[in-house]
Amino acid sequence: MSKRAYNFCAGPAALPEAVLQRAQGELLDWHGKGLSVMEMSHRSDEFVSIATKAEQDLRDLLGIPSHYKVLFLQGGASQQFAQIPLNLLPEDGTADYIDTGIWGQKAIEEASRYGHVNVAGTAKPYDYFAIPGQNEWKLSKDAAYVHYVANETIGGLEFDWVPEVGDVPLVCDMSSDILSRPIDVSKYGMIYAGAQKNIGPSGILVNIIREDLLGRARSLCPTMLNYKVAADNGSMYNTPPAFAWYLSGLVFEWLKEQGGVAAMGKLNEEKKRTLYDFIDASGLYSNPINLTDRSWMNVPFRLADDRLDKPFLAGADERGLLNLKGHRSVGGMRASIYNAVDINAIKALIAYMAEFEKEHG
């Protein structure tokens, strides 16, 4: 087999090679059963055991309290933008949202279709290069919930603190930084995360929701989007994306083998520090984000001359450094350095960036 490339894609993102190798080995014959996970009935004892273990491993990794349900859902985080207000926002209620970038804005736009949304805080005055402090927010007195995006994958802003909202349920999109380091789940009413960045392949979403928030769905909420229906049916009201669920479970096992999220947090801190330090010391590359708000997982950077973008990307591709092109809405470059992207990938990227700067700087 040819050497695997270093994949800096924002999502679907790199998966641990050990996970891919195990899935390859089990593809035709899972545990001697003579069939693939893709061919199993989701009601079978075999698949139920896969699903049960995946949930327990995730609970172990994040220290999820027993009064939280763990749901494996379909539709990705974008579907949650509608599903959240349908389940948690009364028709005459208000939801507070924090705008720190494109994904926060999409959540606000969708929620506004179902009720009153108060944009309690926004990074717009800072041109989305910094997160407004909570002292700048204007939270509602009676909000049904407060929603924010922990890490904006496109802009490269990330909260390094948890908002204090009292008894109001805190709802967080952690699609791109879940499992990157320890968190206190008990501070949240609900956490949701699309899988295709730090969990597994696309097609499945993890939802961690406090039990008292179940059963609040509006009458018009489709059955398939009702959190309580999903919880009551073990996330199997209909046929789930079984193979994506299985692969996510393998990633959870791999994370435990690496020492869990505490160990992963130390590795991720080293990775992001190494890359940002190089960028900051460079004369060709720059990152505009406020130092304390820089993302651990998604590192956007620009070259001093946009005309160098194409040759930079071409040279990166030749060296097996893939998917470094920034999001179409902002341009530039972006290195997504999720859990499966190890320090060797960072070192290889920096070596190339230094070489390119020597030639073009």
From Swiss-Prot:
Co-factor note (free text): Binds 1 pyridoxal phosphate per subunit.
Required cofactor(s): pyridoxal 5'-phosphate
Entry keywords, A to Z: Amino-acid biosynthesis, Aminotransferase, Cytoplasm, Pyridoxal phosphate, Pyridoxine biosynthesis, Serine biosynthesis, Transferase
Positions contributing to L-glutamate binding: R43
InterPro entries linked: Aminotrans_V_dom (IPR000192), Pser_aminoTfrase (IPR022278), PyrdxlP-dep_Trfase (IPR015424), PyrdxlP-dep_Trfase_major (IPR015421), PyrdxlP-dep_Trfase_small (IPR015422)
Pfam assignment, any one: Aminotran_5
Chain sites annotated for binding pyridoxal 5'-phosphate: A77, S78, W103, T153, D173, Q196, N238, T239
Entry's EC annotation: 2.6.1.52
Molecular-function annotations in GO: O-phospho-L-serine:2-oxoglutarate aminotransferase activity; pyridoxal phosphate binding
Pathway(s) it belongs to: Amino-acid biosynthesis; L-serine biosynthesis; L-serine from 3-phospho-D-glycerate: step 2/3; Cofactor biosynthesis; pyridoxine 5'-phosphate biosynthesis; pyridoxine 5'-phosphate from D-erythrose 4-phosphate: step 3/5
GO CC, any one term: cytoplasm
Top-rank lineage group of the source organism: Bacteria
Modification N6-(pyridoxal phosphate)lysine, positions: K197
Reaction(s) this enzyme catalyzes, per UniProt: O-phospho-L-serine + 2-oxoglutarate = 3-phosphooxypyruvate + L-glutamate; 4-(phosphooxy)-L-threonine + 2-oxoglutarate = (R)-3-hydroxy-2-oxo-4-phosphooxybutanoate + L-glutamate
GO BP field: L-serine biosynthetic process; pyridoxine biosynthetic process
Subcellular location: Cytoplasm
Family, as annotated: Belongs to the class-V pyridoxal-phosphate-dependent aminotransferase family. SerC subfamily.
Subunit structure: Homodimer.
Function field: Catalyzes the reversible conversion of 3-phosphohydroxypyruvate to phosphoserine and of 3-hydroxy-2-oxo-4-phosphonooxybutanoate to phosphohydroxythreonine.
NCBIfam families associated with the record: PRK05355.1, serC_1
Name listed for the protein in its UniProt record: Phosphoserine aminotransferase
